[in-house]
C-alpha cells in the first residue's frame, strides 16, 4: 500500500518480466529530487525502469509510486510526469508549436494557458523562432529539443529523459545541461539515461548502476567509488620531474605503485599513483614540497583517475558488463 503523503520516487521490491525474459529484478530504490542518471549497457534494465516510472508498463511484482501516485492512476500520474523519449516520431504535418499545443490539450490546459505554456517551452529550449515551422523540416538537434519541450511544457515535477543530449551540437548541449541543472536545483526530479558517461559525470547528482536487470550500486559517484575498498585508488598527478616524484612517494606505506605518464595534450608529463588512501598521497606531496625533497617540483594538477561513472561501473560488473 502507498503511504499517505509519501513523496519522492519509490520502487519497492519491483520485478518486471516479459514472459520468461527478465527486465528488472528485486529493485528497491528511493530517488530524491535532482538529477539521477541510469548507467548500464543495453539490456541492463534502464528502459524497463523508465517505463515503469512513466506507467507505460506495470510491475510483475512489487510497487512503484511517483510522488505518492501509483501507475494505476494514469490521469494523476501524467500530470506530474514528463517523458522525453529517444524515438523520432511526431504527428504528421505538425509544427513544433502545434505539437506542444496538442500535448497541453491532453493535459487539460485551456487554450490561452496552453498558448502561454507552449511559448515558454519553446523559449526554454531555444526554439522560439522555429516554433511555427514543420517538425519535418527540423534538423536532428532541433527535433531533440522539441521532444524535450514536449516533456516539460506542462511543468511536470518529474522528468524522464531517454538520451536527451543525443544529436545536439556543443552549444545546444551546454544550454540543455544548464537547463537540467536549473530544474534539478529548483526541486524537480530528473531521471536520465545516457550512453555518454563523461556527461553523466558532469551533470548527475547521483547515479543508479544496473547490470542484467539488477541494481548493482546507487548514490553519488564519488561515494560509490570510496566504498570500493577492494580496488585501490588511482590518482593522476601532472607535474614537472615525475620520475623524481615517483621515487619519493613510492616508499610511503599507503602507496602501492607509481607509473610515469607521457606528456598530455598540453605538454605536461606526470605520473599515476596507485594508493590505498588518496588523502595520504596529497599530504605526502605537500610534505615533500615543503621540505624541498624534489627540487624544482611544480604541480600542475592532481585528480582522481578512476572515480568516474565508467570506471566505477567496470569495477562493479567487470569487462563482461559491456559499455554503458
Model-found features: residue ranges?
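Conserved ABC transporter NBD signature motif
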Residues: 62-77
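Helix-to-loop junction immediately C-terminal to a conserved catalytic motif
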Residues: 54
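Catalytic Walker B motif of ABC-type/P-loop ATPase nucleotide-binding domains
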Residues: 159-163
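ABC transporter nucleotide-binding domain
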Residues: 177-274
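Conserved ABC ATPase "signature" region
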Residues: 101, 105, 112-130
Amino acid at each position: 500500500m502507498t503511504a499517505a503523503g509519501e513523496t519522492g520516487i519509490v520502487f519497492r521490491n519491483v520485478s518486471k518480466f516479459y514472459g520468461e525474459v527478465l527486465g528488472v529484478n528485486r529493485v528497491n530504490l528511493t530517488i530524491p529530487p535532482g538529477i539521477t542518471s541510469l548507467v548500464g549497457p543495453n539490456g541492463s534494465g534502464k528502459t524497463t525502469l523508465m517505463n515503469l516510472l512513466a506507467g507505460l508498463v506495470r510491475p510483475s511484482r512489487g510497487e512503484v509510486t511517483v510522488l505518492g501516485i501509483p501507475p494505476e492512476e494514469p490521469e494523476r500520474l501524467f500530470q506530474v510526469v514528463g517523458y522525453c523519449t529517444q524515438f523520432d516520431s511526431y504527428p504528421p504535418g505538425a509544427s513544433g508549436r502545434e505539437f506542444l499545443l496538442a500535448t497541453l490539450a491532453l493535459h487539460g490546459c485551456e487554450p490561452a494557458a496552453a498558448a502561454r505554456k507552449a511559448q515558454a517551452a519553446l523559449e526554454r529550449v531555444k526554439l522560439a523562432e522555429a516554433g511555427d515551422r514543420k517538425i519535418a523540416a527540423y534538423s536532428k538537434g532541433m527535433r531533440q529539443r522539441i521532444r524535450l519541450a514536449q516533456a516539460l511544457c506542462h511543468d511536470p515535477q518529474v522528468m524522464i529523459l531517454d538520451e536527451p543530449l543525443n544529436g545536439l551540437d556543443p552549444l545546444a548541449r551546454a544550454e540543455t545541461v544548464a537547463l537540467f541543472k536549473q530544474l534539478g536545483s529548483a526541486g524537480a526530479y530528473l531521471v536520465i539515461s545516457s550512453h555518454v558517461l563523461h556527461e553523466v559525470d558532469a551533470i548527475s547528482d547521483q547515479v543508479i548502476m544496473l547490470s542484467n536487470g539488477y541494481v548493482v550500486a546507487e548514490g553519488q559517484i564519488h561515494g560509490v567509488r570510496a566504498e570500493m575498498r577492494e580496488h585501490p585508488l588511482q590518482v593522476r598527478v601532472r607535474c614537472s620531474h615525475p620520475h623524481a616524484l615517483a621515487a619519493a612517494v613510492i616508499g610511503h606505506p599507503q602507496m602501492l605503485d607509481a607509473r610515469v605518464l607521457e606528456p598530455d595534450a598540453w605538454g605536461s608529463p606526470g605520473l599515476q599513483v596507485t594508493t590505498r588512501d588518496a588523502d595520504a598521497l596529497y599530504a605526502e606531496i605537500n610534505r615533500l614540497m615543503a621540505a624541498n625533497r624534489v627540487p624544482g617540483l611544480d604541480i600542475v594538477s592532481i585528480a582522481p583517475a578512476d572515480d568516474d561513472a565508467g570506471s566505477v561501473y567496470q569495477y562493479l560488473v567487470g569487462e563482461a558488463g559491456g559499455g554503458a
